[in-house]
Amino acid sequence: MSQSRTYQVRTYGCQMNVHDSERLSGLLEAAGYQRAAEGTTPDVVVFNTCAVRENADNRLYGNLGQLRPVKDANPDMQIAVGGCLAQKDRGEIIRRAPWVDVVFGTHNIGSLPALLERARVQREAQVEIVESLERFPSTLPTRRESVYAAWVAISVGCNNTCTFCIVPALRGKEKDRRPGDILAEIRAVVAEGAIEVTLLGQNVNAYGSEFGDRQAFSKLLRACGEIEGLERVRFTSPHPRDFTDDVIAAMAETPNVMPQLHMPLQSGSDRILRAMRRSYRAERFLRIVEKVREAIPDAAITTDVIVGFPGETEEDFAETLRVMEEVRFAHAFTFQYSKRPGTPAASMDNQVPREVVKERYQRLLELQERISEEENAKFVGREVEVLVAEGEGRKDDVHRRMSGRARDNRLVHFAVDEGVTVRPGDMVTVEVTYAAPHHLVADSGIRNLRRTRAGDAWEARNAPERRPTGVLLGMPKVGAPEPQPSVVGGCCDS
């Protein structure tokens, strides 16, 4: 294979998919591919798909249809489809889009380079789906999108049986990574410049169930607190069933674990929670929130909510609104229920009419928008520490601002004084001057700027390549990647 073949990975879905795409990119580059420059047509396009939402199928097949004339004009181009939708649809993808070259599943992403080569040599589509994961794939190369913040997967799969969710069927039973492997990867990314790590799992706080340690997750959080140079630790997404007191204590007592918690509610109605097979009730959820706020008063709590689950009545929906008003989430990812073939909920009676779902959804949005704005308004006049990010603010250039995340993960847009150089990965302290439902603004200037190792790493990664002036041995070069859009919600949310 020519060393000049280029690739592009298109990612849909949750944070786990984003991290899987980093590993797919690492695999391709290890096999000699180069990332396609923006505006060019890649030799290989990889779709890393999601199967959680109803429009996932339409989105994939629509994009595949757009690529058909490109493939017709360039038969050597290859198209690969992986991820949860590939695990679900398998050979159906080739039937509906016969110009696709490779279909691979969630359990064998490491096979992608070999499958591409086999398809190229044999001139026929390759479909390879593995039914289950034998062990956690800890050794796959990774091309990280960020040098200052990193995803680190601690488990894959899920042992829950929520009636609306197809993820366990596609990702399999939970497989836990060994603690030593996790901590070794965290130390490695910190050595490369990262100062923030997010621990990932479909049900992240159930970590340890495979090897029989019910406190493994809290122990892991405390171990992260001992890693020199690691300034921020986050995790997503926990399940209320497994949110135990030892986890709350570890969050409160480990300084680099951030005061932020994303915990899916899904519904405030006990009747609907039972139909969803969620193994908690509203009172249990509220008690967890109470304990978290007792231990971590400044914690920002976010959630997921599904509107219009089969059988949901106006009384059930009112219970959801009541719980949301009581908790006062900093933010909520809200979804209109959609049928997923293969899930028990898809065949339930009493499917809620679409117009009713939309009307309730709008009321839910209006409530959460008000709460988010009221909670954010409490920050006006307060100073916050922000880890400067890349690609977080769509209008930063227009407003001459930069953006980043506060300790509690609130998005902050801040003005940069003329003549001051701030890099992604640096830390700034700013005073909030304005609050909106989804972000804070700090236009009064930077109170403190701390240049960090992460900022140094970002600067080194984005420095122009220098041409050698003598006769030197050829060394591999690392290009500057484009930032990937942040992805929220989705199948990581338990």
UniProtKB/Swiss-Prot annotation:
Localization: Cytoplasm
Gene Ontology terms: cellular component: cytosol
Compositionally biased tracts (Basic and acidic residues): 458-468
Annotated residues for binding of [4Fe-4S] cluster 2: 158, 162, 165
Cofactor note: Binds 2 [4Fe-4S] clusters. One cluster is coordinated with 3 cysteines and an exchangeable S-adenosyl-L-methionine.
Start and end residues of each Radical SAM core domain: 144-374
PROSITE patterns linked to this entry: MTTASE_N, MTTASE_RADICAL, RADICAL_SAM, TRAM
Region ranges (Disordered): 458-494
Binding site for [4Fe-4S] cluster 1: 14, 50, 84
Main location: cytoplasm
Listed InterPro entries: Elp3/MiaA/NifB-like_rSAM (IPR006638), Methylthiotransferase (IPR005839), Methylthiotransferase_CS (IPR020612), Methylthiotransferase_N (IPR013848), Methylthiotransferase_N_sf (IPR038135), MiaB_methiolase (IPR006463), rSAM (IPR007197), rSAM_horseshoe (IPR023404)
Domain TRAM: 377-446
Cofactor(s) recorded in Swiss-Prot or TrEMBL: [4Fe-4S] cluster
Family to which the UniProt record says this protein belongs: Belongs to the methylthiotransferase family. MiaB subfamily.
Protein name: tRNA-2-methylthio-N(6)-dimethylallyladenosine synthase
Gene transcribed to yield this protein: miaB
